[in-house]
Design a protein with these regions (language model features):
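Phosphate- and other anionic-substrate recognition elements at nucleic-acid/protein interfaces
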Residues: 1-158
Length: 158
């Protein structure tokens, strides 16, 4: 099964595509989709949509996984922008007829590390170990996206 994990954001969206085959996890592709604050909102959302659409077309995932939205009540604009980025990512998945699932951060940490209150560093180390990376990706957004994909495989026992 090929799984696309996406860590949405308006500025840097991380993604990771992995493949579970015969009990092993293989890295297919990972990286980031970047936008700049110099672009207007519509342009940034279009960039995220088109890059996600191309990623799906190039890697042919069976499913897409996103983290359930969490934003602090003191920062409603963050939740608003995150929701917009997630919306265009969902749209790309829907138009490609790919199911999209979500997991909360605690569920992801529990699947990857074995405890829901694991630190970000613990998750990063386990992600790197699970797919045989010698060093961590430059962006934590990539590691988070890979964690989403790996967690889905573990949770569904692919």
């Amino acid at each position: 099964m090929r799984i696309l994990g996406v860590d949405p954001a308006l500025t840097v969206t991380g993604y990771g595509v992995i493949e579970f085959r015969k009990g092993r996890i293989g890295l297919v592709e990972a990286g980031v989709i970047k936008t700049t604050v110099k672009q207007d909102l519509a342009g940034r959302l279009e960039r995220i949509y088109r890059a996600t659409e191309k990623l799906i077309s190039d890697t042919h995932p069976d499913i897409m996984v996103l983290e359930k939205i969490y934003a602090h009540y003191r920062h409603p604009a963050t939740a608003f922008h995150l929701g917009q980025a997630r919306g265009v990512i969902y749209l790309a998945g829907a138009l490609a007829k790919i199911p999209v699932v979500e997991y909360g951060a605690t569920r992801i940490k529990k699947a990857i590390v074995g405890q829901g209150l694991a630190s970000k560093q613990q998750v990063q180390k386990m992600v790197a170990h699970s797919i045989g990376l010698e060093k961590l990706p430059a962006y934590t957004d990539v590691t988070d996206a890979l964690a989403l994909a790996i967690a889905h495989g573990y949770i569904t026992r692919v």
